[in-house]
Amino acid sequence: MARNVEEPAYTVVDTYALFEVRLYEETIQARVRTDGQHYSNATGGFRRIAGYIFGGNQRNQRIAMTAPVHMWAEDGAHWMAFTMPSSLSMEQLPAPNDEGVSLVPNLAGHLAVLAFSGRSHPEKVAKKSQRLLDAVKAEGMEVAGEVVLAVYN
């Protein structure tokens, strides 16, 4: 992880053998629907959002890169998101030039997190996702929402 790269703020609420529960603060994300059936095919989505933060917006404004890059599948589509710097409000963010890039509030909430390292190939992501879901259910918790892959460089 590079130094001086902002990450979403959170508090660890509880720690279990295989995962921890974190309470994340509200953020704003730049999101795009990506092509392909797997996270590994998301290069086009990455380029589109990177284009937005590197000045592809109505003010030609550069926006600081944050970590991680979020990827998930929902309703038969794959999505990618970059979290916007916490110093910028929705009103301060310039509109994207690319109509496929949307600025979306990401509400505060609790997330179960299973950290792992290495490449995020589809088989590994599927295995880790299932392991997380099984561990959460084994602790008697209800799963709500989709599994989100958070990729750090």
Language-model regions: role of each:
Residues 1-153:
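A solvent-exposed interaction/effector surface
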